[in-house]
Swiss-Prot record:
Family: Belongs to the EGR C2H2-type zinc-finger protein family.
Main location per the UniProt record: nucleus
Official protein name in the record: Early growth response protein 1
Site positions per UniProt: Interaction with DNA: 3, 7, 13, 31, 35, 59, 63, 69
Length: 194
């Protein structure tokens, strides 16, 4: 052929393609190769040697081109995660905007009877030394409307009348607490017990 090479070893290697000469032989299975690097790679199939490790997951490979192909899998996975995170971010911001508009559309009396999961701090119109307990989770207003108003009113009255130990307070009572009305009639010792 008319190909030219700048180095003699490249010419020698190329001539073996035309002649079919394979001077490098595996001593284990007697298979012949035209290039020494191909023999070296082949011997790894017998020894199990895998000197090329993936920098991301640590998986090992006998050939560098296998590692390179494998690394592309991680790059595709990374691209998918970035795309997914971007779509989740866009979705969560639109949900947050919807939630805040829904939370502001209810009047304060309905919000007291049917609290939403949106965390809101209400200041009490009346001073009270016994704040009402805060609930960590509430049903959404649409779910709460399935309960009868008598039940919801009873639950609200119970929640605002009796403090619960160990519960963090995020809401101040809009209703004057029953305990605050009774503090003047109890002695300090009785108040500590309650």
């Amino acid at each position: 052929c008319d190909r030219r090479f700048s180095r003699s070893d490249e010419l020698t290697r190329h001539i073996r393609i035309h002649t079919g000469q394979k001077p490098f032989q595996c001593r284990i299975c007697m298979r012949n190769f035209s290039r020494s690097d191909h023999l070296t790679t082949h011997i790894r199939t017998h020894t199990g040697e895998k000197p090329f490790a993936c920098d991301i997951c640590g998986r090992k490979f006998a050939r560098s081109d296998e590692r390179k192909r494998h690394t592309k899998i991680h790059l595709r996975q990374k691209d998918k995660k970035v795309e997914k995170a971007a779509s989740v971010s866009a979705t969560s911001s639109s949900v947050a905007a919807y939630s805040s508009s829904v939370a502001t559309s209810y009047s304060s009396s309905i919000a007291t009877t049917y609290p939403s999961s949106v965390r809101t701090v209400y200041s009490s119109p009346a001073s009270s030394s016994y704040p009402s307990p805060a609930h960590t989770t509430f049903p959404s207003p649409s779910i709460a409307t399935t309960y009868s108003s008598g039940t919801a009113t009873f639950q609200t009255q119970v929640a605002t009348s009796f403090p619960s130990p160990g519960v963090t307070n995020n809401f101040s009572s809009q209703v004057t607490s029953a305990l605050s009305d009774m503090t003047s009639t109890f002695s300090p010792r009785t108040i500590e017990i309650c």
